[in-house]
Amino acid sequence: MMKMELRLLVSLIFILCSISMLAAEENLEHDQINLMTYIVHVKKSENVASHQSEDLHSWYHSFLPQTFPHKERMVFSYRKVASGFAVKLTPEEAKSLQEKGEIVSARPERTLELHTTHTPTFLGLKQGQGLWSDDNLGKGVIIGIIDTGIFPLHPSFNDEGMPPPPAKWKGHCEFTGGQVCNNKLIGARNLVKSAIQEPPFENFFHGTHTAAEAAGRFIEDASVFGNAKGVAAGMAPNAHLAIYKVCNDKIGCTESAILAAMDIAIEDGVDVLSLSLGLGSLPFFEDPIAIGAFAATQNGVFVSCSAANSGPGYSTLSNEAPWILTVGASTIDRKIVASAKLGNGEEYEGETLFQPKDFSQQLLPLVYPGSFGYGNQTQNQSLCLPGSLKNIDLSGKVVLCDVGNVSSIVKGQEVLNSGGIAMILANSEALGFSTFAIAHVLPAVEVSYAAGLTIKSYIKSTYNPTATLIFKGTIIGDSLAPSVVYFSSRGPSQESPGILKPDIIGPGVNILAAWAVSVDNKIPAFDIVSGTSMSCPHLSGIAALIKSSHPDWSPAAIKSAIMTTANTLNLGGIPILDQRLFPADIFATGAGHVNPVKANDPGLVYDIEPEDYVPYLCGLGYSDKEIEVIVQWKVKCSNVKSIPEAQLNYPSFSILLGSDSQYYTRTLTNVGFANSTYKVELEVPLALGMSVNPSEITFTEVNEKVSFSVEFIPQIKENRRNHTFGQGSLTWVSDRHAVRIPISVIFK
């Protein structure tokens, strides 16, 4: 009897232990499911600020429980870009951590979005001259590309004739075997955390393209499907490249990886950082790129970022911090042209990358599927969405499809599946006259919104409408270039409307550069892509050229040089236009279109030291703790004379004007000739008066600084009727230089 009771007791204990273990495992699994990566900012301690990375790592670990699985949960420890770390926590653990006095903040990380031959000539860069002379071409400068990795074997990254990297370079290469890294591609790191850590090979194709745009070598006979044929080169062909992979196709681009990449890049010794990604408008103390870029600026590193592809609406920007160069996108004067010719003889030009040589010029039946549907199906058919055309006989016909909802490639496949033999893509009103060279799956052309309306009217009013496509190949010399493309994000900045953004526009439409996989069965592979992702590395490369010429210039001085020398007219000599062919406003263009040749010799610059941003940040109303997250030193705004945004020594003015006058100062640094005199020229915004004192300034030595003041005086309110903002400029003119800054005024 006792033995039986003992067996029952043992069995009961075993069952209870098993239940307990199962419950523990279930809780563990539940915790694992609830784990999220948190970005943790810690109050900076002077005792550990100068410690080695290992000591810093141990200090960060001290904030976590002793029983905590540090090795499995700690993601990154930051040294340069932040006082803090990234760690996997449950919400409960994060809440407990935030209760510690030394913790400034702990918040879940977010995922950032990517902003996705002829351009050097278009920008005035010529081999053997100026910035492209043999002793420049970006020589000695290191550009860090924070992106999706790279295809390192592309000839755009060969190192023939290149010297070793500068002695300051501390980075390393995670590619193994052979000569993958070289004197061109000097470093490559993968910051994407995964179960199996892999080398930083490209998996989106984005990073290879952006790296080549910034600093690709000269490659002859580059083209895509035989189009845009010529010598491909980045902006700074002799600059060194360091690659930091932060994105993959499974988890996107995490902010913990981006902060880690910026942290490592600064430590490695890069001179320029290029980031073609962003998060939208955020407080700067929550924006990983703004935080990392401030640390970069403190260390003399220039940071260039894409403005985003969320235009053409106002206040759609990413990367708004004033210590970042925010880059919008413009067209170039090269187009890959085709036209839609109608049965009435009218012809409407557009673009396509697919240029068949043998397409018949015979007029074919032309249909608009949106004419056949009912209710919601009408819109689906007008957009040529997948499956929407299966009940329509399109055999042997040219099909008109509206742009939108799905890619043009998908629309083309639907047309093909339904028997269509050619496609005309009609832009939406938002796209206007912006067209793109795309490798369609059938003969096709994208035409403007206005052309699309006319073609629809022709179809509706004609008994048997007909059309054909005429393919014209690559045409150079569009007098309307540069123009602002529809997708380029616009200002004003949401987070800091007193700083004009974007800063600049640069080439971002139909850009040919290196690609990881051939799209036309030709090796080496190139592709043509559009986006502010493309305009950003153009400016990164141009910054590298300027840095090579002027190694002692600060990031703010380089930015000023780029902005104050920008073009405001297109090749036809009229103001730069937008996608509607209306004059582009200041919130689309910023200072204007980059002119690298002039930027190398600006005459004067508006310089800013890192500490100058603290009064500005206090003026934004940020708390001391929030500012400390950005600047990484102790701040007390009560002891700082805060300034309004427009008082920052920025190479533009953006003011919100009511009924009272506003008064600001700026300081100029002479980087031109020692003895020079400048006089002010004003383009005064609508309904405004302006006074500049002094109106003439004289310099007697290089690096001399002179200040001036500007008063903005509101005029009669009736003059503002039907206007929400005005724009103008202030230019200091000498016999050799014109140093222009744009002015935006929002009326309240």
Curated annotation (Swiss-Prot):
Enzyme nomenclature, EC number: 3.4.21.-
The residues that the database entry marks as glycosylated are 376, 380, 405, 675, 722
Compartments, as annotated in UniProt: Secreted, Extracellular space, Apoplast
Domain (Peptidase S8) spans 122-600
Give the record's keywords alphabetically: Apoplast, Glycoprotein, Hydrolase, Protease, Secreted, Serine protease, Signal
InterPro entries reported for this sequence: PA_domain (IPR003137), Peptidase_S8/S53_dom (IPR000209), Peptidase_S8/S53_dom_sf (IPR036852), Peptidase_S8_Asp-AS (IPR023827), Peptidase_S8_subtilisin-rel (IPR015500), Peptidases_S8_3 (IPR034197), S8pro/Inhibitor_I9 (IPR010259), S8pro/Inhibitor_I9_sf (IPR037045)
What does the entry give for GO biological process? Answer: arbuscular mycorrhizal association; proteolysis; response to symbiotic fungus
Outline the extent of the PA domain. 365-454
- Domain named Inhibitor I9: residues: 37-115
This molecule's function is given as: Required for arbuscular mycorrhiza (AM) development during AM symbiosis with AM fungi (e.g. Glomeromycota intraradices).
Identification of the protein by name: Subtilisin-like protease
